[in-house]
């Protein structure tokens, strides 16, 4: 019924050697599926990429054919530099922003505003349970907004609408399903959440 989509994924590319990475990427291309991996999560990871491949992570992924898959998703992308943001902009590459996990693991603050400005689809995720302690998407939305403000040192940055878009249509675009879900439109699936606003915890709404 179209509710299940299968992607190929390596949680971290370092969990496989180069041959294994290549096989996984080739599998995604062969079967026409998306490919997902965690990348540029920690600063030490970037250093390891440069040691192994002689270049930053996104450029190493380009050499492996990661961007030639039908759709590629990168979780975290905390340590992307401007050249990497430019590289993935305009390609079928998206980012899963995991703000609470990035705080818990002291990974850093992802340059989300730069990615959005470059037109890169960004959705909001939670990462795994041990990296987060819960799967509360409303908490993720709040923290995404707060971290965006802290990153830019601007209280007006990453406002509620920016975060709501990432949590809805942004996430749908990130997985290539924005034609089906992510916004309330005629012909789309009724992917709707109702929230009570008449409770103390929802004040000032």
Segments (PLM) and residue ranges:
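Histidine/acidic residue-rich metal-binding segments in metalloenzymes
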Residues: 1-94, 106-122, 139-142, 179
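Residue-level marker of alpha-helix boundaries and capping positions
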Residues: 14-15, 75, 102-103, 158-159, ...
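Short glycine-/small-residue-rich Rossmann-like dinucleotide-binding loops
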Residues: 78, 99-100, 198
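Short, acidic/turn-prone active-site loops that include or flank metal/cofactor-
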Residues: 41, 99-103, 128-130
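Short, surface-exposed loop/helix-turn segments at secondary-structure junctions
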Residues: 200-205
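His/Asp/Glu-enriched, well-ordered alpha-helical/loop segment
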Residues: 63-69, 113-199
């Amino acid at each position: 019924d179209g509710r299940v989509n299968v992607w190929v994924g390596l949680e971290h590319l370092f969990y496989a050697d180069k041959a294994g990475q290549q096989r996984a990427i080739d599998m995604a291309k062969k079967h026409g599926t998306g490919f997902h991996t965690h990348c540029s999560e920690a600063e030490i990871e970037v250093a390891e990429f440069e040691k192994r491949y002689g270049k930053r992570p996104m450029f190493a992924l380009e050499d492996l054919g990661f961007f030639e898959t039908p759709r590629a998703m990168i979780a975290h992308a905390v340590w992307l530099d401007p050249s990497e943001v430019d590289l993935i902009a305009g390609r079928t590459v998206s980012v899963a922003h995991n703000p609470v996990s990035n705080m818990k693991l002291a990974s850093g603050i992802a340059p989300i505003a730069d990615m959005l400005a470059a037109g890169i689809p960004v959705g909001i995720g939670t990462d795994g349970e041990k990296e987060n302690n819960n799967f509360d998407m409303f908490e993720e939305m709040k923290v995404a907004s707060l971290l965006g403000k802290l990153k830019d040192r601007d209280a007006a940055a990453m406002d509620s609408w920016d975060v709501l878009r990432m949590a809805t249509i942004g996430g749908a675009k990130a997985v290539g399903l924005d034609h089906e879900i992510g916004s309330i439109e005629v012909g789309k699936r009724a992917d709707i959440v109702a929230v009570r606003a008449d409770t103390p915890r929802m004040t000032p709404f």
